[in-house]
């Protein structure tokens, strides 16, 4: 039972499933005339929540993805061999994190050479043809691919994987897309092929967090309290983009019923016509979110974080 004696404000941080929880609790509270206020705070590296320009956590994860891609490029260029490196990145239905791989590009590096997102139908023959074209001008090909890419029938590439599992919410945990593509590429080209799955490292690399992301995360948490004190319940906090250059945002809130169980995917116009890269518009959207460095404290040569020993119980 809900009890206002325990708390007058309930704040839930998370993604789509967490916002669904906020909606259900708010509905229940209203039905029972409870005084508890329910406010949702976005927090997901997937960046797929409606009602906000982006989500806390995404900028830091995107920064890790971009930095990892750049470092993989440096490693691949050491060897005087024709090679293809496939990097599988999280994203079941939305390809925001995979798109962030493009941020690895700089004055001397154009990789990732190809980017494949779940918003676009994936065709194996075209995939191989794309690689062939890149090989005409480069020795080392680096590819970023979302774990959730689908074929023309809407099937995930790893649907038949023997390693398929489900999370606590019943969502299939996709793993194996990179390995499948690795086998496909090796069979076609016979060159050195390697697939890399960034997996959970994408969401826990605090040593390379985005300062912009952290700053906004602190503020939006404070704004959530302010919203509850305005006697508002059943809302989700969010960001409204005012400008890319210079980067400027405002803090807003949206009725949770317009957010829960919906997904914000990459607009098709932000993906190139070939379906194998992103546009400048998407790059400009992503770029500000990874800016600024987080300086962590080190102890005995490794980052010193708050103890999480209590979580082992």
Question: Which sequence ranges carry the predicted segments?
Answer:
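Accessory alpha-helical/coil subdomains and C-terminal extensions
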Residues: 12-14, 20-35, 39, 55-194
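Residues within alpha-helical segments
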Residues: 2, 23, 103, 222-225, ...
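Glycine-rich, charge-decorated loop segments at or immediately adjacent to ligand/cofactor-binding or catalytic sites
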Residues: 46-54
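Acidic, glycine-rich active-site loops and adjacent beta-strand->loop/helix elements
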Residues: 16-18, 43-47, 91-93, 120-122, ...
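Short, conserved clusters of charged catalytic residues that mark active-site
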Residues: 1, 126-127, 219
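C-terminal non-catalytic interaction/assembly regions of soluble proteins
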Residues: 159-313
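Single conserved hydrophobic/aromatic residue that forms the stacking wall/gate
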Residues: 1-10
């Amino acid at each position: 039972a809900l009890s206002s004696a325990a708390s007058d404000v309930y704040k839930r941080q998370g993604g789509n499933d967490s916002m669904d929880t906020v909606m259900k609790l708010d509905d229940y509270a209203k039905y029972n005339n409870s005084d508890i206020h329910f406010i949702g705070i976005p927090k997901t590296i997937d960046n797929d929540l409606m009602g906000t320009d982006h989500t806390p956590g995404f900028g830091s994860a995107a920064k890790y993805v971009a930095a990892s891609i750049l470092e993989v490029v440096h490693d691949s260029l050491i060897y005087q061999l024709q090679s293809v490196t496939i990097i599988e990145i999280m994203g079941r239905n939305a390809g925001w994190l995979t798109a962030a791989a493009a941020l690895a590009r700089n004055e001397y590096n154009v990789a990732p050479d190809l980017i494949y997102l779940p918003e676009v139908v994936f065709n194996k023959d075209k995939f191989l043809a794309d690689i062939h074209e890149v090989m005409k001008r480069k020795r080392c090909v680096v590819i970023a691919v979302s774990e959730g890419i689908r074929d023309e029938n809407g099937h995930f590439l790893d649907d038949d994987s023997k390693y398929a599992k489900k999370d606590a919410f019943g969502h299939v945990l996709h793993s194996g897309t990179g390995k499948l593509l690795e086998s496909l590429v090796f069979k076609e080209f016979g060159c050195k092929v390697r697939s890399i799955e960034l997996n959970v490292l994408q969401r826990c690399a605090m040593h390379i967090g985005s300062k912009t992301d952290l700053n906004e995360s602190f503020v939006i948490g404070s704004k959530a309290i302010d919203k509850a004190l305005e006697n508002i319940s059943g809302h989700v906090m969010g960001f409204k983009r005012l400008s890319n250059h210079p980067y400027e945002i405002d803090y807003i809130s949206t009725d949770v019923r317009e957010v829960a169980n919906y997904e914000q995917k990459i607009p098709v116009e932000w993906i190139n016509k070939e379906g194998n890269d992103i546009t400048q518009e998407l790059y400009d959207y992503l770029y500000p979110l990874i800016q600024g460095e987080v300086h962590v404290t080190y102890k005995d040569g490794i980052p010193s974080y708050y103890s999480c020993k209590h979580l082992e119980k």
